[in-house]
Curated annotation (Swiss-Prot):
The gene is panC. The keyword ATP-binding applies. It comes from Caldicellulosiruptor saccharolyticus (strain ATCC 43494 / DSM 8903 / Tp8T 6331). ATP binds at residues 30-37, 147-150, 176, 184-187. GO terms for biological process: pantothenate biosynthetic process. The lineage of its organism: Bacteria, Bacillati, Bacillota, Bacillota incertae sedis, Caldicellulosiruptorales. It catalyses: (R)-pantoate + beta-alanine + ATP = (R)-pantothenate + AMP + diphosphate + H(+). This is Pantothenate synthetase. The reaction proceeds by a bi uni uni bi ping pong mechanism. It is found in: Cytoplasm. Beta-alanine binds at Q61. Pathway: Cofactor biosynthesis; (R)-pantothenate biosynthesis; (R)-pantothenate from (R)-pantoate and beta-alanine: step 1/1.
């Protein structure tokens, strides 16, 4: 496995691989790898000749009072995990390398960023879209792999790829969960023991909504209320949002029909966690 820190070096490597007719799968990450990330690597390896992973904690997708400085980082650990999974190249640039002093461009996907995490974290998805477009231009992948856990991020990236005619196939991958249902996340490391127990309520609330829908409930405000009641029974919880949106358009809905994404963000202590499920009626 080769670690590459410079953009021009990564681009040269990619040019050579493309000349040899190799297909490239790309797994963009912010590091502190967990089983969710590794499942993306396995998927990439099964579909491409070469797998490139980026590890870059992207400062421009964090708000002023968010956790950029304390976001967990352990490059040695990540490198070992990536190597063990058979990643071919790790692109590990510095902030200066990605954003030199004269950097002036922002990529902004409208409308689908007005709700959910886009509303709670203004500017977040501009930061995501900008870094992902930059990474796509550096790595020039045939396919790129994203977890369904960040459902809104996935929608934003799909929209950007479509609108800007990018030659990359976006491959969504299922959420990987702990045994008790908690969606795997690098931010789970922030939770205390008691908070960790409370955190299972996100998935329980999503499943409660799913069960109620299966029993015939279609009214979104009633479903939200049931989820809120369950979540707020737990200690340490504060709801950021619960949203029901059409899976394809990302439009908020008031009645459950067709394919629906149910997504939520909940603070457990000071840690903001997200999760979602898809239901079809």
């Amino acid at each position: 496995m080769v670690v590459v820190g410079k953009i021009h070096e990564m681009k040269d490597i990619v040019k050579k691989l493309k000349k040899e007719g190799k297909t490239i799968g790309f797994v963009p990450t912010m590091g502190y790898l967990h089983e969710g990330h590794l499942s993306l690597v396995r998927k990439s390896k099964s579909q491409n000749d070469i797998t490139i992973m980026s590890i870059f904690v992207n400062p421009i997708q964090f708000g002023p009072n968010e956790d950029y400085d304390r976001y967990p980082r352990d490059f040695e650990r990540d490198k070992n995990l990536a190597e063990k999974e058979g990643v071919d190249y790790v692109f590990y640039p510095s902030v200066k390398e990605m954003y030199p002093d004269d950097f002036k461009t922002v990529v902004s996907v409208k409308k689908i960023t007005d709700i959910m995490c886009g509303k709670s974290r203004p500017g977040h998805f501009d930061g995501v879209a900008t870094v992902v477009l930059k990474l796509f231009n550096i790595v020039n992948p045939d396919r790129a792999y994203f977890g369904q856990k960040d459902a809104q991020q996935l929608a934003v990236i799909k929209q950007m790829v479509k609108d800007l005619n990018l030659d990359v196939e976006i491959v969504p991958c299922p959420i990987v969960r702990e045994e008790d249902g908690l969606a795997m996340s690098s931010r789970n490391t922030y939770l205390s023991g008691d908070e960790r127990k409370s955190a299972t309520v996100l998935y329980r609330a999503l499943n409660l909504a799913k069960d109620l829908i299966e029993k015939g409930e279609r009214n979104v405000s009633k479903l939200k209320k049931a989820m809120e009641d369950l979540i707020l029974k737990e200690k340490y919880t504060k709801i950021d949002y619960i949203e029901f949106v059409n899976y394809d358009t990302f439009e908020p809905i008031s009645k459950v029909e067709g394919k629906v994404l149910i997504a939520l963000a909940v603070f457990v202590g000071t840690t903001r966690l997200i999760d979602n499920i898809v239901v079809e009626v």
